C-alpha cells in the first residue's frame, strides 16, 4: 500500500444504504509506521483477520481482508485511489458467510490531509465523533497478544 503523508487526516465514512445515515467523520494522526494501519482502518475493525492481500488495480489499489470471528468467516473487498499525500478515496464491502447475520451495506470513504497532528495526539490515534480517542497501534498490539493468549475455538469462548 502507499504510505500516507504524516500528519492529521480527516476521514469521512458514508454508508451506502438507502436512506443513508449521516456520514461519520474521524481524525487520524498518521506517521510512516502507522500509515497502513490507518489507511485500512475504515474496513479492518475485526479481530481474527489475516494480513491484507494488496494488489495494484485500475489506477489504485485493491485490498482483500479475510477474517474469522467466532467461527464466522468474513471477506472484505476494498478499493483505494488518490495521491495519498493530500487526498484519497475508497469503498469497501464485507461479505459474511452466514445466513443468520445481515449483510452490511457497502461503504465509501474519503481521506483529506489537514496538516500537523493536534497537540496531544500521537501516531496511531483515531479521534471518534464523540471525541473519544483510541490508539489503533496499541489496539493492534493488544489484539495480537490476545489472539496468542488463548484458543478462540474453545467451547464457550466469549469476549
Residue ranges and their predicted role:
Residues 26-28, 51-53, 75-82, 92-96, ...:
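Hydrophobic/aromatic beta-strand elements that line small-molecule binding cavities or substrate pockets
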Residues 11-48, 131-136:
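Short, solvent-exposed loop/hinge segments that bridge or flank secondary-structure elements
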Residues 35-79:
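Mid-chain, structured segments of secreted extracytoplasmic proteins
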Residues 99-143:
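Edge beta-strand at a domain terminus
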Amino acid at each position: 500500500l502507499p504510505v500516507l503523508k504524516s500528519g492529521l487526516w480527516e476521514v469521512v465514512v458514508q454508508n451506502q444504504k438507502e436512506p443513508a445515515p449521516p456520514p461519520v467523520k474521524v481524525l487520524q494522526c498518521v506517521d510512516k509506521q502507522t500509515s497502513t494501519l490507518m489507511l485500512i482502518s475504515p474496513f479492518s475493525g475485526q479481530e481474527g483477520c489475516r494480513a491484507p492481500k494488496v494488489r495494484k488495480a485500475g489506477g489504485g489499489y485493491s485490498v482483500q481482508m479475510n477474517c474469522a470471528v467466532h467461527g464466522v468467516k468474513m471477506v472484505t473487498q476494498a478499493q483505494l485511489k488518490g495521491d495519498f499525500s493530500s487526498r484519497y478515496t475508497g469503498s469497501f464491502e464485507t461479505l459474511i458467510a452466514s445466513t443468520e447475520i445481515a449483510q452490511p451495506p457497502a461503504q465509501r470513504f474519503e481521506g483529506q490531509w489537514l496538516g500537523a497532528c493536534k497537540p496531544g495526539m500521537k501516531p496511531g490515534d483515531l479521534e471518534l465523533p464523540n471525541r473519544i480517542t483510541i490508539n489503533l497501534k496499541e489496539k493492534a498490539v493488544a489484539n495480537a497478544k490476545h489472539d496468542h493468549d488463548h484458543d478462540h475455538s474453545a467451547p464457550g469462548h466469549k469476549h
